[in-house]
């Protein structure tokens, strides 16, 4: 009888430790961003698709939040924030080269160790751990001059394109 009790107890411990979940509150400061009319989302990696969880800002303070139940075993998995409803991931934050990104996983963020309910506060496109945002660099006026005196083609205009204008 003692062995049966111990076996049942061991199975209960194994099952409950195997299925540990926690509520993780994600707070995302969007003060430096023009928020898309499509919404702000959390997705990627262990979270799911690009529109898996919509964040909301009911008090209008610029901090968008969502509570997500996550398996504790997903610690170290990836996630990302998106400014807009873009199934092709085109509106995800750009963390390339920042210390909070995982270059082996599309430069997504890395979940910290999850041992219980917790809060993650950060800034869109930055590695803040307290929810604060660094001021964006000041805008600069740039003048491009193109010498077209040697051009013999038929186009009548010069266009400049790049990542700065959505190219």
Cite the ranges covered by each PLM segment.
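A short, amphipathic beta-strand motif
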Residues: 22-30, 142-147
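Compositionally biased low-complexity segments at domain edges in trafficked proteins
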Residues: 112-143
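Compositionally biased regions
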Residues: 8, 18, 23, 91, ...
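Exposed beta-strand face motif in extracellular beta-rich ectodomains
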Residues: 75-79
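Bacterial Sec-dependent N-terminal signal peptides
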Residues: 1-25, 135-139
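Aromatic-rich carbohydrate-binding modules that target alpha-glucans
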Residues: 32-74, 84-112, 148-167
